[in-house]
Amino acid sequence: MRLTLLLEMAAKLKLPHDYRFGMSRPSTLAAKRRNPPGKRRSKVFVEPVSKEEWQYFRGDTVEVLHGKDAGKQGKVTQVVRARNWVVVDGLNTHFRYVGRTDEYRGTYVASEGPLLLNQVSLIDPTDRKPTEIEWRYTEEGERVRVSARSGRIIPKPVLQRRDGIIPEQWKDGPKDTSVEDALERTYVPSLKTFQEEIMEKTGIAENRRHRKSYWY
């Protein structure tokens, strides 16, 4: 585990109760522009889905059930649990201009729009067709997703962080800080100033005597 991951775990972003989640992460500039301080936005009602019953994860292969791309399959690239959204790579796309100004018309790019959970379905590995799933436990006690039609286990995709690192496959390099080194207590409290500590470490002896000072 890297030191940056430990710092991310320690930092918790506090959001107002009426915050409206979108495609951008709350800490990004785009999300802050859509949720400026003091602005109240209408509430968006979302069907609650518990963490234990959530079925879709980044890297899953799903099939679109409704819309212009119905019947097409793709890989989930983003999950927004606060809105019951999933984003599928290359599907449900719309085109827009990015970076438009008065002097420049901008760049015309394709952007994937979000899909609700009831608009997609997981793929059965047996026949590559959409299927409902159930959460069950294996003999080893592992909780897995099982196809309701064929009984085949649908494995969860390997977790990949936003920086492209897969924790299970990561190997610390010479420049990575280990967990033991990050958690080791090396600071020793002292009443000495920083300059006095440096002098003690380098063996500098102070022979000068402080002059008397007078206050009037």
Curated annotation (Swiss-Prot):
Tissue distribution: Ubiquitous. Expressed at greater levels in the kidney, adipose tissue, muscle and liver than the brain, heart, ovary and lung.
An example molecular function term from Gene Ontology annotations: RNA binding
Subcellular localization: Mitochondrion
Record flagged with keyword Membrane: no
Residue span of the annotated presequence: 1-9
InterPro entries: KOW, Rib_uL2_dom2, Ribosomal_uL24, Ribosomal_uL24_CS, Ribosomal_uL24_KOW, Translation_prot_SH3-like_sf
Main location: mitochondrion
One Gene Ontology CC term in the entry: mitochondrial large ribosomal subunit
Quaternary context: Component of the mitochondrial ribosome large subunit (39S) which comprises a 16S rRNA and about 50 distinct proteins.
HAMAP family associated with the record: Ribosomal_uL24_B
Protein name: Large ribosomal subunit protein uL24m
